[in-house]
Curated annotation (Swiss-Prot):
It catalyses: uridine(54) in tRNA + (6R)-5,10-methylene-5,6,7,8-tetrahydrofolate + NADH + H(+) = 5-methyluridine(54) in tRNA + (6S)-5,6,7,8-tetrahydrofolate + NAD(+); uridine(54) in tRNA + (6R)-5,10-methylene-5,6,7,8-tetrahydrofolate + NADPH + H(+) = 5-methyluridine(54) in tRNA + (6S)-5,6,7,8-tetrahydrofolate + NADP(+). This is Methylenetetrahydrofolate--tRNA-(uracil-5-)-methyltransferase TrmFO. GO terms for cellular component: cytosol. Keywords: Cytoplasm, FAD, Flavoprotein, Methyltransferase, NAD, NADP, Transferase, tRNA processing. It is found in: Cytoplasm. The gene is trmFO. Belongs to the MnmG family. TrmFO subfamily. Its main location: cytoplasm. InterPro entries: FAD/NAD-bd_sf (IPR036188), MnmG-rel (IPR002218), MnmG-rel_CS (IPR020595), MnmG_N (IPR040131), TrmFO (IPR004417). PROSITE patterns: GIDA_2 (PS01281). SUPFAM superfamilies: FAD/NAD(P)-binding domain. GO terms for biological process: tRNA methylation; tRNA wobble uridine modification. It comes from the Bacteria.
Length: 448
């Protein structure tokens, strides 16, 4: 297939990946037609018509370079990511993590793209894959059925899916502050989380209620299949009575404050279990229940989650919801630049490619956008080295075992190992990986 001679590039979908791709293309002096159907047609999960809306959590996760996602974010900052830049401008306290005021952040991304002189925003649903120009498809895990059929047809591959869930958000003014305390795990960073401690008796009663609560129904033809990073809390609870104690209710590093007077198990300094609440907006009036993605019926959510100490009278401004997410057989269908193997004028980006997470989705849009622009200019594709986070992620999703392919978060396990003797200290090893990654990325920057 010959390269398109159009004078612009299409980007379909203005989520995190599409927004990033559109910006990276326009930054390189190429006109962009950015299509977004929200405003014309709603999705089951989005609440606004803003671009790059965050629907599951307001957290971009850890910020340290000894954390793989922290490294990925730093690489993206150096590549002038619109998502990272606007995220930084709308940060809210979150200890050692990066969390944002989701409304302020999405509005600022939207405004920047809508006001860009080279970006034409078109509010319309796309049901056919355009063949008039180089196109980046970033319609996300909630891709409409009509377009999903065309994507499957053009790729000649089967679609996959998994379920994704969002946590409830509560009104801070309805939290009983006498029963909770402010602290970040291990006192890392500023004290940014409200902690709801549980005794063993309280936890056992909560576990019983959670595992017997009624879930919202699924379509009978859909087999449940969850991505581990966004698993419903009730599914986790059913895996074992202590599973949550090693997950979102882990008490380690969240000791009682000296002035705590509530119930506790004997003289223990650490609660048996802890539910954490994280600030969800800049005003600090909303908090989400960390790790409590759920598919329980709304009435059951209210009944069960009000058993959490401090939330007995909590007001839920949004209940948890679950939706089906689609993703592609990327190992067979895409190259490391997220370019279609069967149609070189077509790129894909975002969670539909099998990257998992906000930051990872934006990173895939960055890679696809840069390479769509390079194709437009008839320049050689830019493949970031596997020593970097932004290079290792697309390499993983396009080289994984297709038969067992599952969505993947960025992690140090997929980054190329260091040469020489293994550094035994994990922190030092990760620091060395990060140092090498940023040095190698700086070499790539010279090509841009």
């Amino acid at each position: 297939m010959s390269q398109s001679t159009a004078t612009y590039i299409n980007v379909i979908g203005a989520g995190l990946a599409g927004s990033e791709a559109a910006y990276q293309i326009a930054k390189r002096g190429i006109p962009v037609k950015l299509y977004e159907m929200r405003g014309v047609k709603a999705t089951p999960q989005h609440k606004t018509t803003n671009f790059a809306e965050l629907v599951c959590s307001n957290s971009f996760r850890g910020d340290s370079l000894t954390n793989a996602v922290g490294l990925l974010k730093e690489e993206m900052r150096r590549l002038d990511s619109i998502i990272m830049r606007n995220g930084e401008a709308n940060r809210v306290p979150a200890g050692g993590a990066m969390a944002v005021d989701r409304e302020g952040y999405a509005k600022s991304v939207t405004a920047e793209l809508e006001n860009h002189p080279l970006i034409e925003v078109i509010r319309d649903e796309i049901t056919e894959i355009p063949n008039d120009a180089i196109t980046v498809i970033a319609t996300g895990p909630l891709t409409s059925d009509a377009l999903a059929e065309k994507i499957h047809a053009v790729n000649g591959g089967d679609g996959f899916y998994f379920y994704d869930a969002a946590a409830p958000i509560i009104d801070k003014s309805t939290i009983d502050m006498s029963k909770v305390y402010l602290k970040s795990r291990y006192d890392k960073g500023e004290a940014a989380y409200l902690n709801c401690p549980m005794t063993k008796e309280e936890f056992m009663a909560f576990h019983e209620a959670l595992t017997t609560a009624e879930e919202a129904p699924l379509n009978s033809f859909e087999k449940e299949k969850y991505f581990e990073g966004c698993m419903p809390i009730e599914v986790m609870a059913k895996r074992g009575i202590k599973t949550m104690l090693y997950g979102p209710m882990k008490p380690v590093g969240l000791e009682y404050p000296d002035d705590y007077t509530g119930p506790r198990d004997g003289e223990f300094k650490t609660p048996y279990a802890v539910v954490q609440l994280r600030q969800d907006n800049a005003a600090g009036s909303l908090y989400n229940i960390v790790g409590f993605q759920t598919h329980l019926k709304w009435g059951e959510q209210k009944r069960v989650f009000q058993m959490i100490p401090g939330l007995e009278n909590a007001e839920f401004v949004r209940y948890g919801v679950m939706h089906r997410n689609s993703y592609m057989d990327s190992p067979n269908l895409l190259t490391e630049t997220f370019q279609s193997r069967s149609n070189p004028n077509l790129f894909f980006a975002g969670q539909m490619t099998g990257v998992e997470g906000y930051v990872e989705s934006a990173a895939s849009g960055l890679v696809a956008g840069i390479n769509a622009a390079r194709l437009f200019k008839r320049e050689e594709a830019l493949i970031f080295p596997q020593t970097t986070a932004i290079g290792s992620l697309p390499h993983y999703v396009t080289h994984a075992d297709s038969k067992h392919f599952q969505p993947m978060n960025v992690n140090f396990g997929i980054i190329k190992e260091l040469e020489g003797p293994r550094i035994r200290d994990k922190k030092e090893r990760y620091e060395a990986i990060a140092s090498r990654a940023l040095a190698d990325l700086d070499t790539c920057l010279a090509l841009l």
